[in-house]
Amino acid sequence: MVQYLGLNIVSVAARKGSKNLSKFVDKYNVRSSYDSWSNMIKNENLDAIIIALAGIKRLKIKKSAEILKSDEFMPAAGQGIIVVQSLKKNKIINKILSNLEITNVRHQATAERATLKILEGNCNSSIATLSSIENNTLTLSARIYSAHGKYMIEASNDGPISQSIKIGENVGKQLIKKGAQKILESCS
């Protein structure tokens, strides 16, 4: 739970709880269902919960007060990307799946995952990434937050989409030079 301007706010993910929270004094993470979150708001004197927009839409929640902008509140690597895995030997399924693939999304996911790999990050790491493609140029930004949001480092890189792995690795290396390992170790 975090306290901000006298409000008690719960985040359901470590990355969400760490982001932009240097002004908050305390927090805790909750992994449970929307019903549990709703009950927590009612029963534990909580004022708000930070949850993903996908969850709000899926659950058809109409009470959301604000949708946070992705450049202010960066998502986790690969957030919102649907991945389907199949066996190499299953040629029929692979042909069907190849028709569904969006090439730009693959390049974005590849760059974001390359950053995570360099940082040895996972879904519990307080690492955020945001990528975009315009005119065949991939731009990737990433941030790492300390456990309570007191510290944040960021890096970005861009280049041709064909270099998505290199772009992601460059961002990861920039973050390491800025102290990423120390921040990530303090969060675990």
Where are the regions a protein language model picked out?
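Short beta-strand-centered segments that line the small-molecule binding cleft or hinge
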Residues: 1
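Small-molecule-sensing regulatory modules
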Residues: 5, 18-188
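Short, well-ordered beta-strand elements
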Residues: 7-13
